[in-house]
Amino acid sequence: MTHSDANMTENGRMSGKRMIALVAALMLCVISFQLNASMITPALPDIAEELGVSVNDVSQVSSLFLLFGSIGGILITRFSDYVGRRNMLFFILFCLFVGSLLAIFSTNLPLLLVGRALQGLSSASFQISYLVLNEALDAKSFGLALGVITALNGGIGGVDGYIGGLLTEAFGFRSLFIVIIAFVVISFFGVLAAFPKNMKPASTGKFDWQGGVCITIGVVCLGRFIANGSSVSWTAPLTFGFLVAAIAGFILFYLRELRAEDPVISIEELKSRQVWPLIAGVLFTLAGVFPVINFTLVVFSQNAEVGFGMSASTSSLFFLVPPAVIGIVAAPFVGWMAPRVGWIRTLRIGLALCLIAMVVIMLFPTNLPVVVACVAVLGVAYNGLSLTTLNGLGVVLSPEASKGSLPAVSGACFGLGSSLGMALISPFASNGTVAGVRTAMIISIIIAAAAFAASLAMRAAKGAQS
């Protein structure tokens, strides 16, 4: 037996040192992307000052990054079925490298924005990593490895954002992109060395660019509709224009997929109980639970009259850091557990616990020990159980003929769901009353209940993992 054979299972999947090396390489790839999201936020005021623009203008540094993240998540993930996961990871790293160079040497905001757009395309690193793990590892190893990768989604427990602030204060915002380039270079050699050489493209046809562009327009314009409606006005002409463009994009996508020889995702697959319930589950889970942790409780806790009167830093320490840290610890364990208990069953457990915790918060919003305890429960139930299994199910339930289709579409729903939830509850959660917080919580509970209902409708394909 060769050394290489010793690191392969009986069914040809990776194990041992080769598996560890692959997971490490993929972790570096997703960290390279994630640092662009988490480290840059503290540097926005410094960027505005150095480039001579307003803080409002420099907010495009984040919004454009997220916009192109939606585009990359859909197109690049599905395109990897045709050109290979390895090639698309190299393309992602190339975009990160060039985008970071442009950011380092930018002398004006437009040049920096071009760099940020290129960096945003790399959001597909998460979905492609999940697909690679599913194809290279056995079912049980896949779950554990996916949990490890999922734990990095959203940052490294807040440490990366803190380091970003320190680097900006000491060396300026350009130092952040130098750090990112270092990670990109290490990631490149990691993928070069650890990626399985025998992994071939999953699809042999021709990518449906027309369908891909249509669904991307629909998703992006829907996201802009939600953002513009909540920040400007739901009746503003631009908001209405985004809604019309989103509807047109989805209609054109539907019509295109009906006649496409090799669709992005077929209409029959969309109608199946292994696809639409997951898309709905992702959308409603994020819309229901994300705003509770990241907005409702944070805003209420800083209200000195009816809330807990906390400072911004204390509020973060009580309500943002615990669920993030708990999620990082819980995600790998959930990934290990889900293949044994069942991916869909694990998701249902997580959503049920989310609903229980949210109902308790709604009933006792002014009881600090109770609310903090429920936030800890949400750290396990939402950050750990729900997010890990939703990411895993995107791969596990994806149709065999188009493995990248469901991760691409469901991945886009993560951002849409969180934006939708924030838009729906923010008018109530921010009105400075206990009744407003309770109303926001009731809305969140109803949406999360819809996510649980969607999980009850989920079914794996015959003979597949569930």
Features from the language model and the residues they span:
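Extracellular/periplasmic helix-loop-helix junction of adjacent transmembrane segments
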Residues: 41-71, 109, 313-314
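Helix-breaking motifs and short loop linkers at transmembrane-helix boundaries and internal kinks
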Residues: 50-52, 84, 104-111, 138, ...
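Helix-to-loop junctions at the C-terminal end of transmembrane segments
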Residues: 72-85, 168, 329-343
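Paired small-residue
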Residues: 95, 99-102, 110-118, 369-378
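Cytoplasmic helix-loop-helix junction between adjacent transmembrane helices
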Residues: 117-151
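Hydrophobic transmembrane-helix bundles of small-molecule transporters
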Residues: 169-281, 288
